[in-house]
Amino acid sequence: MYSRTVSTVGTAVAIMAALVGTAASHADQSAGAPSSDDTARPLMLDSEEGELRTRRIHTDSSSPASSQFILKVSPKNNGSQHLVAGTEVLAPGATLPKHRHLVQDEILLIQSGTAHVWLGDQERDLHAGGLVFIPANTWISGKNIGATPMALTFIFSAPGFEETMRCNSVPAGETPTPITPEQQKDCAHLGHSESAGRQDNPKK
């Protein structure tokens, strides 16, 4: 079902290229900061290629947004020092819990399906081809309000949150292990993110 996640590859590539330029200019200001020209490897991946991971089982009454996701671009995947990108598919009715990223900007590309998105003080429905820009420190939540799976591509302006995602998951093929709310908080700290708690999940 991950084939839907590449329906707007051209848009994703253009956005990623713009973010690379911005991120690189900031990196140049930091002494000793690694350069993507020195470390990043060119990469071409099909829809189902990448680091497929299965989310761990929550020990409370909550459930993750999706059972699996694919990390495609990150320092560990191809040496990228400026961008992180991946894909996931949300089932009908599934939600993205309210959270924010303390360091990274994020872009969400809706490749298929229909989402209702809460972003800061804004709220609206978005459809296939829609885009959400999430500045750092902005609260975001969403829900698949359609009758079909919703495919997403996520792009971060700097590495970090992929470590939260890895902490909350296991490699595909391994048995998912339980994860407590306290462990989820520890995982969030790894990627410089913060959750508002499941009680704040949106209703639609």
Regions found by a protein language model. Name each.
Residues 80, 116, 136-162:
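Ligand-binding loop in jelly-roll beta-barrel domains
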Residues 103-105, 110-115:
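Glycine- and acidic-residue-biased ligand/ion/polar-headgroup-sensing regions
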Residues 122-136:
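Short acidic-glycine-tyrosine-enriched beta hairpin
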Residues 10-20:
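Bacterial N-terminal signal peptides
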Residues 25-82, 167-204:
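A short, N-terminal "cap"/entry segment at the start of jelly-roll beta-barrel domains
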Residues 71, 86-101:
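Conserved short histidine dyad/triad with adjacent acidic residue
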Residues 1-11:
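Bacterial N-terminal signal peptides that target proteins for export
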